[in-house]
Amino acid sequence: KYFIDQRGQAPLYFEEEGKKYNKPSYWAENKWLNNRYYQADVPVREQEFAEGHAVRAVYLYSGMASVARETGDVTLLKACDRIWKDIAERQMYITGGIGSCDVGESFSYDYDLPNDTAYNETCAAIGLMFFARRMLEIRADSSYSDAMERALYNGVISGMSQDGKRFFYVNPLEVDPEACEKSSIHFHVEPVRQKWFACAC
């Protein structure tokens, strides 16, 4: 509960780190690495929509839902409801994939759901299932179980080969092998499952 309550409150860790070393945080060098990216721009109870790094976001939202359920925190549950509605209605592919933007592996803006450059990280599908499960434990609503099923079959199971030795990090809806090789906007897409990734979740 402490970490949920502290998220988005001053002082922010990365800002304090910058003061300590008398320079901007390493993480502040890129424009998109801001407090919204870390889901820390406002206290969690004030968050209106899914934002930032998709995997970290749904892990945070899972924690928020668990704390809301255990403590009866109505304000926190309302934030979870708003965020869930945003994901389910404006940020999710028909496959259950989330996190459409390859820059920062993140949520983008409403209805930005491209097929060929979709990120839809396998780990985000797993995190979405965690969030949906926790929401389903609070209230029986088929939107949660439907999202779990879509994410499981289209983003989790598909992310690993049957022998468990090769993986998809991203799950776009359209793959052109030539584009993966020659177009910089497709460099994050692999046409076949890979043995290993530089950053494995």
Where are these regions (language model features)?
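Glycan-recognition and catalytic cores of secretory/periplasmic carbohydrate-active enzymes
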Residues: K1-C201
